[in-house]
Amino acid sequence: MRVRVKSFLFSFLLCAGLAAFGEIAVTFYGGAGQVGGSCALVESGGFRMLVDCGTAYGDDHTSTNAQAETGFRFDPASIDCILLTHAHQDHAGRVPEIAQSGFKGAFWSTEPTRDLLALVWPSQLVYDESVRRNWVWSAKAKGGRTRKVHWHADCEWAGKISAHNRRSFTGTRAELDAHVTTTLSACRECLETEVETLVARFKTAPFDVPTKIGPFAVTFRPVKHIPGASAIYIAEGTNTLVFSGDLGTYRSRLVRTIEPARAADAVFIESTYGDASSGGREAVEAEYARFRKDVGETVRKGGLAWVPAFALDRTQRVFYEISQGMAKGDIPADAPVYMLSSTARNVMQAYFDHPEWNDVDIRAALPLFKRTKPRFTPSKHVKGGGILLTTSGMMDAGASVGLLPDLATNPAVRVCLVGYQSPGTPGHSLRSGAKEISVGGQQIPVRCDVKSYSCFSGHGDAAENDAWLANNRASRIFLIHGDADALAARRKGLVDRFGSNVEVVEPFKRYVFPVH
């Protein structure tokens, strides 16, 4: 009897040792079934953290987004920390909002991600439609100057407004603009204070060094989508989950190699371009050559090459290619270049200040940058030839919108589209060959020439992403960050090549992984 008891106890303890002693749960509140809005909740033993907190793109702002009409679909105060894969808005755009919505923890990222966010926040915060603020301004403006609107509690200028002249309103910036009849510009001190407050909440981790965060060992590994971009490895016990973030590509002039992912139990991988192929290096080089030729041809004819692009990384890649085109003789070396976005200019300067951020040292383009002009007037600068860089890349915001009525109607202008164009945007209409586009409620005839290029994409194609997954053929693979067609095509391709352990992530579904 005693032998049987001992045998039973031994078997019980052995089984208990092999059994799971906990679980990691993953729920996607954004980035599932859509491009953008990336936001995944990772939980274990009562510890709750987010991987990314991004803004959604496109027209679908309902079921699959992290956004909801009342804010977040989870309690921000319940989140212990937030990990950020990189600084693009679709992965980090809601950081200011969640910071003001009850979240009290730290943001974790690489140093370049933190530093790039600090550069893009000033322009984002001015018109951030997701954040409700207590706005304060004076009814009286000295000397007819534009009134400044304040919102930060520590702003000394807001404190100097007399009770008689003090005006206030609570709501988003759009609601404020609809409420007042005068022009209000953002207080610089409030902007700087809010950026400093956000930066102070960041903790940074070096690449490839495990960091203890709650019950997890978290490792940031470079994926070279933009400077600082990381795949995030989350390990507990013997289990490891990987979140790819956005994977880079050899198509970028600034990237040489991307190391494959390490083996993991589960991989959540982006599927932006589905199972599509870029055509290989020769096709990409031919596309770059076509871009340089088109820009050079336009300038030599006395026309304007207009390149709308995202302020963060896309403008910098385009600028570097323009400088290379001038060095090769494809583009006139004396062509005037205009870069209107202060954010894009600040990021460009940061690239020069930190050559270690990229695989390629771009400081050869610094002389061109020093003569680049920050202002552009269509009536003065279209004639004679030149190159214009503006935001936004989809031409639905920033300087691009204001310039469309003058430039889209001018046959001397060639629009060079270098990024994704969401349906409903002016950029999408131009790329689709529209004869008219809608700008501010007006129909504008299109007389400009329009070209489109895919070589500037920061995302890897199917073959590149397969190579990144090479060590994970036996892993569970989950597809995120893609539209329905791209996700379906990507799943089919991966099942054919990797096996049947591939699934498309559903929004709000709880995925559980036992911890051993």
Spans of features found by a protein language model:
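Bacterial N-terminal signal peptides that target proteins for export
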Residues: 1-9
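N-terminal signal peptide c-region/cleavage motif recognized by signal peptidases
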Residues: 15-17
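Core dinuclear metal-dependent hydrolase active-site scaffold
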Residues: 21-77, 196-256, 379-381, 387, ...
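Pre-active-site segment of Zn-dependent metallo-hydrolases
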Residues: 32-37, 44-197, 249-257, 432-440, ...
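Active-site neighborhood of phospho(di)ester-bond hydrolases with catalytic His/Asp-centered motifs
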Residues: 51-54, 79-88, 92-95, 107-110, ...
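Cap/insert and terminal regions of metallo-dependent hydrolase folds
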Residues: 227, 231, 250-339, 414, ...
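A general structural motif
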Residues: 284-288, 365-377, 393-396, 431-436, ...
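Hard-cation-handling environments
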Residues: 291-426, 480
